[in-house]
Regions:
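Enzymes that bind and transform nitrogen-containing heteroaromatic metabolites
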Residues: 1-184
Length: 184
């Protein structure tokens, strides 16, 4: 069985999407070469949320399932929603109305032995709380948004510790230095 992956890009100030689920803030910024290709090869299914689906569907009606990784990935896309009855039909997208654990089980089964990638901050948060996220990858983008959807919004919750999946000390902090882009 595949793993449950939380794979996300995040601004320096901790946002994974701008207001209204906007993602255009990432244009012109690139991830390490090979990272997307590795993800595309590993992923067998995607599980997202309704608010993100609706925001993307408003920009690219009928083409949400073709958007992951710039169209390089294809496979089953699941959208968890409280209201599947008013969801717009789209090829390659299945709407689920169940609890998060069951949605993960359904999507993992559809992934056919490959990994399931979470495309929703809220669903990912719930999966973290349930202890069912196997791996978390964050791409820290060199931009500050000021507002939007936070990476892990869980007021009053307990801290969640992660071990780095790299050589060396898995608890070692990552030190990054930046300067304003005008200094290039």
């Amino acid at each position: 069985m595949g793993k449950v992956l939380w794979h996300v890009a995040m601004s320096l100030d901790g946002f994974v999407a701008a207001d209204g689920h906007a993602m255009d803030w990432m244009s012109g910024v690139h991830v390490t070469p090979g990272v997307h290709e590795e993800s595309v090869a590993r992923i067998g299914a995607i599980l997202g949320g309704r608010r993100g689906f609706d925001a993307l569907a408003a920009r690219v009606p009928g083409k949400v399932a073709k958007q992951p990784y710039g169209g390089a990935w294809s496979g089953p896309v699941f959208v968890l929603t409280h209201h599947p009855e008013d969801a717009p039909a789209e090829d390659g997208v299945a709407f689920l109305s169940c609890d998060v654990r069951e949605a993960v089980e359904i999507a993992l089964a559809a992934a056919d032995g490959k990994d399931l990638e979470l495309h929703s901050q809220d669903i990912a948060r719930q999966c973290v709380e349930l202890g069912i996220v196997d791996e978390f990858t964050v791409h820290l983008m060199p931009v500050m948004l000021g507002s939007g959807i936070r990476l892990f919004d869980n007021p009053g919750g307990k801290p969640v510790r992660w071990d780095r999946v790299h050589d060396g000390d898995p608890a070692l902090a990552i030190d990054l230095r930046f300067r304003p882009a005008a200094h290039r």
